[in-house]
Amino acid sequence: MGNEYVLETRDIRKVFPGVVALDGISLKFRPGAVHALMGENGAGKSTLMKILSGMYKPTEGVVLYKGVETEFNEPIESIRLGISMIHQELSPVPHRSVMENVWLGREPLIKGTPFVDHRKMRDDTKALLDDLELAIDPRIEMSKLTVAKMQMVEIAKAVSYNSEVVIMDEPTSSLTRSEVDHLFKIIRRLKDQGKAIIYISHKMDEIFSISDDVSVLRDGKYVGTYPAAELN
């Protein structure tokens, strides 16, 4: 890659009317590592992730992807570059199928036509879910799934982009213990593939179980970054 870090923020500042949400945040994310972001509510974690995923633009500062200064005008630009995000607030299309949710906006077309290739979409979704060991029917309507299963579909969707950076914002909030273990298995595999995982959680046991690096934010300011092994 020619650069030690796949993603960096330099002196990121984000100001909303009457509120400084982020003030001079500089972070570096390594490929093949899980980087946890810690901080109380209001620390600025979600705001920073929305900047990295193209939902917000920073007031000041820059984002670098593979050493190149980058600016996102909308989320699809960050996805195309190689950054995908699993949001804490799920936003599925409830009356569409699992496969339609996974490939929403990038549906495969029958060659030479404007028509969606439903068979390919179903087969690709099944292959993706099987690869992640998720027992979910690609054809089932999203509204018929449990919240936990919807969360796993969102995780599968993020993986389907084959992104270099995967942001997970409180991904276990609706998962059972066994589902958390399954998610951690997926995370470790992504890590082995050289992906950078940014992991946001309030659960200390999860952070120490899965993370390599831990950064702490407080009141929109950077406190420090530490090896997880030293904090545990």
Positions of PLM-derived features:
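Glycine-rich phosphate-binding loops of nucleotide-dependent enzymes
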Residues: 2-232
